[in-house]
Amino acid sequence: MSKPIVTLATCADFPNLDEDDRGLPQALSERGIEPRIAVWNDPGVDWSNAGVVVMRSVRDYARKRNYANFLRWARSLERPLNHAEIVDWFGDKHYLKDLAARGVPIIPTTWLEPSANLSKHQVHTRFPAHGDFVIKPAISSGGRG
């Protein structure tokens, strides 16, 4: 009888997984599962043979023009643990608006949409003159973006 397969999807920046995930393959093996690691956009990977696919260190999805390709790939998976609809919702930080509308506390957030085409001065005037703040693209991952 063959072992169940779990493929940990990552990106080319972390072909052997992120440091926090490096213990996963051994933990899966110890539980009788065949672990695999694959870069999500590697054309040489046969995803139809990947078993359950768990998206882990797929951080490069946020790079320009990668997001649509990433979602296309996520939708093509036969057995994803992270379903494409959730990945799409969670991949764009506007999901925080949905959470706030349902009463979940979020950090104070000012949304600056790219279509507003604001100058640096206009962006600066949207924030209080005191305190720290973070400017981050809506589609970003980790501390990147």
Q: Which residues make up each language-model segment?
A:
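Short, charged N-terminal beta->alpha structural module
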Residues: 2-31
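Active-site nucleotide/adenylate-binding loops and adjacent lid/helix of ATP-dependent enzymes
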Residues: 2-10, 71-77, 85-145
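Short glycine-centered, acidic/aromatic-flanked micro-motifs in structured strand/loop junctions
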Residues: 10-11, 56-57, 82-84
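Glycine/Thr-rich phosphate-binding loops of Rossmann-like dinucleotide-binding domains
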Residues: 16, 62-63, 143
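Short, surface-exposed alpha-helical segments at coil->helix boundaries
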Residues: 18-22, 68, 93-97
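A short, well-structured beta->alpha microelement
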Residues: 29-45
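General small-molecule cofactor/ligand-binding pocket signal
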Residues: 34-38, 81, 110
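Short, structured active-site "lid" loops
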Residues: 47-74, 78-79
